[in-house]
From Swiss-Prot:
Residue ranges with Pro residues bias: 526-536, 548-585
Pfam families reported in the protein's UniProt record: Drf_FH3, Drf_GBD, FH2
Mitochondrion is among the record's keywords: no
Location of the DAD domain: 1030-1061
Organism, scientific name: Xenopus laevis (African clawed frog)
Record protein name field: Disheveled-associated activator of morphogenesis 1-A
Source organism phylogeny: Eukaryota, Metazoa, Chordata, Craniata, Vertebrata
Amino acid sequence: MAPRKRNSRGVSFIFCCFRSSEHPEITYRLRNDSNFALQSMEPALPVPPVEELDAMFAELVDELDLSEKHREAMFALSAEKKWQIYCSKKKDHEEGATSWPEFYIDQLNSMAARRTLFAMDKEDEEERNKTIESLKTALRTKPMRFVTRFIDLDGLTCILNFLKSMDYEIAESQIHTSLIGCIKALMNNSQGRAHVLAHTESINVIAQSLATENIKTKVAVLEIMGAVCLVPGGHKKVLEAMLHYQRYASERTRFQTLINDLDRSTGRYRDEVSLKTAIMSFINAVLSQGAGVESLDFRLHLRYEFLMLGIQPVIDKLREHENSTLDRHLDFFEMLRNEDELEFAKRFDLVHIDTKSATQMFELIRKRLTHTESYPHFTSILHHCLQMPYKRSGNTVHYWLLLDRIVQQIVIQNEKGQDPDTSPLENFNVKNVVRMLVNENEVKQWKEQAEKMRKEHNELQQKLEKKERECDAKTQEKEEMMQTLNKMKEKLEKETTEYKNVKQQVAELTAQIQELNSRTVCAPGPGGPPPPPGAPGGPMSMPSGNFMPPPPPPPPPFPGGMAPPPPPPPPPPPPPGGPPPPPGLPLLGAAPPGAPLGLSMKKKNIPQPKNPLKSFNWSKLPDNKLEGTLWIDLDDAKVLKILDLEDIERTFSAYQRQQDFFVNNGIKQKEMDCTDDTLSSKMKVKELSVVDGRRAQNCNILLSRLKLTNEEIKRAILTMDEQEDLPKDMLEQLLKFVPEKSDIDLLEEHKHELDRMAKADRFLFEMSRINHYQQRLQSLYFKKKFAERVAEVKPKVEAIRDASKEVLQSKNLKQLLEVVLAFGNYMNKGQRGNAYGFKISSLNKIADTKSSIDKNITLLHYLITVVEKKYPKIVNLHEELQTISVAAKVNMTELEKEISALRNGLKSVENELEYQKTQPTLPGDKFVSVVSQFITVAGFSFCDVEDLLSEAKELFVKSAKRFGEETNKIQPDEFFGIFDQFLQAFLEAKQENENIRKRKEEEERRIRMEAQLKEQRERERKARKAKENGEEEGEFDDLVSALRSGEVFDKDLSKLKRNRKRIVSQTTESSRERPVTKLNY
């Protein structure tokens, strides 16, 4: 066979591509006898010694990753030929950057980013395709180091990303076919093939290319996937890829697209045999390789998918093409099918099983299982299948689909629990399920025990959380107390020092005054004799009266500027909601005082109801104010005789009737007539409720969420929630259900019926018995929220303080303002120019000035460019003003309101503490001790906040004046907001400048790469032309070629033909049943 020649640099398809227009050309073709036909060439350098040449040539052959047969052929060459090849390789190594993988990877990424051929001319498309073709040639012909380098740089991932990101136009172009060719060329190398198979999604992405209408691309994809089936570990990957393609292409079933393409016979598919051959070759590889080599069940399982898609009629139609290669694949499919069906039928002592007949298949199963332990389960399966829903709905189909997949899984899964096909049911291991069925009782016991342990765990978890809350609260209190103690120590030391200094100054001044007085006594004035000692107005009276030793220092002020505890106050005022009680007012529930002597009112004879009624909440007119009113002339006794008192009693009874259930039959008992007192007393539970219905309902909801008894709630309030039973949100809700004066009055009237009170009523009644219940609750809520509220306020004050310091101390800000001032004076003329300063709000107007060259460029963009060059430190201005953004969100008015609320709340708690000190201590009442400790700690914490606020205000005023702002007209949020807005605009403009710079660099890089590419294409023109004339195939190509021609199935096909003759002979003799060679599905 004549050798194929190339018109460019010498290329060996299986070895390497040696490109050089200067060196002599080598052309050869590998034959079966391993001889080469080489064109003579003159090496440019002298031939080295034989030993040195052999060592150099051995290094070259090792790089080519050749098989042993090909290595021997290479070493059989003469010394001159070896030297020629080595020189060409050396020249190839010295070529430019475009001959290295980095160049191709950059081009692939660039093309993938552009994604579309839209608005591109034909020349651009051809250039892109030439680049990919050049990569394909390099992967086939370059030394091993090129392929290794390409793999190390994630070249395969670049190709796959390009395949995934293609639009429709590229997918239907030659570029798509060339990309698949690159993968095929990469797999023609042992390392490349291993890398493709090891990649997590390579085969899936290759399978996605079946969606194209480009026939060449489809054929290339099918050839690759068919060959992968022949590679160890590749068969299952192909099946997974086809399942992936089913989801990708929204197929109803797997392999649907293949059968559709196989059946298409219109348009360009009418005489298209290559695609149909490739599909049949792929189907045969899927059926006969992988687990199908050994497992009959697996082959039957997979083939059934194709038969259900209607492949048999399509095969009959394909016979009309009369193509020998295609017929070879069709023969193999049918013979393998007949062989498998015969072997399967032997299991049931038959020649053929009609899998289209449900009756025959049922009978075979029934006969096989009769008189076995499995038969009851078989009948159970049939019985429950009869109970399956048969209505035409979406769920019905899915029930049968689930049953089908479970049976498939049982059939194809091997003994080790491994699935040769993609699992019909994920995470479904038949062996494990069987083991679980055997140990079902044991599993049930473990589940019960696990449930018990789970409940115990939850209970312990709740207890642990409760203890953790207690520990956290105690730890926080301890930390606050330690901080307060340290601050008190510092303050005491400071005041002690000041006191000593003042005392020393007073002593010095006293000594000076005494000295002056003594001098005055010794030298009397000329006005007459001095007055006698001790006389009024005499000089000696001053030291004795006015210069006594200084008194001891006063005690330290009370925390928070509060006065020391005053003497016990008078009795507490009444609860809110009513006027203060006048002197002599009887206690709650006692009889009212008698009428005044001037008007004696006779007690009315008013009928009494049998049961308590809801009260009419009126304001009673006192007897001493009745005289002279119309009330004297009214007689309600007449009206009472007319009214239906029983109906009133039924309608406004204080009892709430609740429906109950019969114990025996569980039927809900309807409300009975009130006249049947005997039956009513048995069927209904009476509850006394005088509280408003909606309020009582909301109170019940709150109590159910608390999950505490009234006694536990009472204990928590008295002990100031020592055990952390009352969360802050629950305390806030409890404050909404404080017993009011009207509620207390009504509840006191029925306190003798405590056991019959409704849940909400009893709760309100028992809470009303706590002295100052509302004030205690408010104090407890304030105590729990105090640290949180201080933690919310303090960062806001600190933000104003720190932001003021930052703008005062920032050198870069000062420098920036100086630069902006210079820009402004330069750009502005007339009255707007010649400025010594500007309002800081002008900073945010810099971006309003647009460039006259590019409207997207503003003065701010330009300013940043200048700053980066001339004042690089200013670029990091935001690092010096880190607190600005926080301070810009602080409203001073709202902040002062929050601090004032804290001050008032602290004062209220202090007042309640003073009141409780005057009251007798109840058992378990810890209000005084807990709150006293809290007031001490909270007072010092609040003093810190107030001092911090004063410092922040002072610094803000200083910073505002510093920038020429009027402090009475600008607030911190507005002042710092100006800087914050400017910094954001500054950083955004800086990023935009960076993006513009990157785009410019990318454009320059693209132009440079295109120039290199153009030069590379010119150098490789001859090499591409030689490639079009034909290429020697490598290992993977040999596999693809054998699969395409059907040679890979020749051995199996011959065996099947012999078996077929034997089967026909046996069938003729036995005449039991005619073998079926074709089944139409």
